[in-house]
């Protein structure tokens, strides 16, 4: 008997979807800073949002950082980021 194990992880499809949502959110007048770096050998995704428009010396309204990994906290943060971006499109 074969067993199947389902693993939740942050993958390239998720990152691509966040990038698409970010583009749509920016077209509605919000500022989104999206970046990917590789500080520990695992890609780190950073999404920072300022509502309405960019203003110098203003803090971000929302900030999300998560690794492209199978760690639960990264998966949860990624889903929170997606959810916030979707809410800004409503």
Locate each region found by the language model.
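Short polybasic amphipathic segments
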Residues: 44-51
């Amino acid at each position: 008997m074969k067993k199947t194990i389902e693993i939740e992880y942050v993958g390239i499809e998720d990152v691509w979807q966040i990038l698409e949502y970010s583009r749509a959110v920016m077209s509605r007048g919000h500022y989104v800073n999206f970046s990917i770096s590789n500080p520990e050998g695992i890609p780190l995704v950073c999404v920072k949002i300022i509502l309405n428009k960019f203003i110098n010396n203003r803090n971000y309204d929302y900030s999300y950082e998560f690794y492209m990994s199978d760690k639960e906290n990264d998966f949860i943060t990624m889903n929170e980021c997606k959810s916030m971006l979707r809410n800004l499109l409503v």
